[in-house]
């Protein structure tokens, strides 16, 4: 693991150096092209040694920049392919590691064993139901409350009920007892009879 980390650091360092070198070469090429354009604007002859030197260097850097751009494109394409391949390999490795913990589910006899155990459980449940039905015939039946217990239970329930504060039914004299209809008002004679 440590060696892998060292290799990764070296690779990243080399990439930084290469990128820095390409940048410097591009700056140099741009400087040579600017010099050529400046001398051209100043009317320097193309056969002048300084012009020829700057033009040659600018051309070399231009060609090198094109090649570097093509290489960079290929490198980017290769790195993308490597990244996809690495992702697929890592995914397959993770899947294999996950399935390794459930190898018994993948064995050829797993389904047969599972079916046999399921049948055995079903048979055991049937046997248990038969045993319960057989034993229930020998269990004593539940005893109900006799009449005296029922009366006692009702009395306790009535004693525990709250006492109402006032009766919901308002009593009044009927016409048969007082001679007055509950819907007709009392006359003077009726009131006198009531007071007596």
UniProtKB/Swiss-Prot annotation:
Signal peptide: none annotated. The keyword Plastid does not apply. One of its GO terms (cellular component) is viral tegument. Keywords: Host cytoplasm, Host nucleus, Virion, Virion tegument. Pfam families: Herpes_UL14 (PF03580). It is found in: Virion tegument; Host cytoplasm; Host nucleus. InterPro entries: Herpes_UL14 (IPR005207). Residues 175-196 have a biased composition (Polar residues). Coiled coil: none annotated. Residues 162-196 are annotated as: Disordered. Belongs to the alphaherpesvirinae HHV-1 UL14 protein family. This is Tegument protein UL14. It comes from Psittacid herpesvirus 1 (isolate Amazon parrot/-/97-0001/1997).
């Amino acid at each position: 693991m440590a060696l892998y980390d060292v290799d990764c650091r070296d690779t990243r360092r080399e990439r930084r150096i290469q990128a820095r070198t390409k940048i410097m070469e591009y700056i140099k090429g741009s400087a040579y092209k600017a010099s050529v354009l400046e001398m051209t604007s100043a009317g320097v002859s193309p056969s002048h040694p300084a012009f020829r030197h700057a033009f040659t260097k600018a051309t070399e850097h231009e060609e090198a920049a094109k090649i570097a751009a093509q290489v960079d494109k290929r490198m980017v394409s290769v790195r993308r392919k490597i990244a996809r391949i690495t992702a697929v390999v890592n995914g397959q490795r993770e899947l294999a590691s996950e399935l390794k913990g459930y190898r018994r589910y993948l064995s050829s006899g797993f389904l047969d064993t599972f079916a046999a155990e399921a049948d055995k459980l079903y048979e055991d449940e049937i046997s248990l139901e038969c045993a319960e039905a057989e034993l229930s015939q020998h269990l004593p039946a539940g005893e109900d409350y006799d009449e005296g217990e029922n009366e006692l239970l009702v009395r306790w329930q009535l004693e525990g009920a709250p006492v109402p504060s006032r009766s919901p039914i308002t009593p009044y004299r009927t016409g048969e007892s007082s001679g007055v209809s509950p819907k007709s008002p009392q006359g003077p004679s009726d009131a006198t009879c009531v007071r007596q």
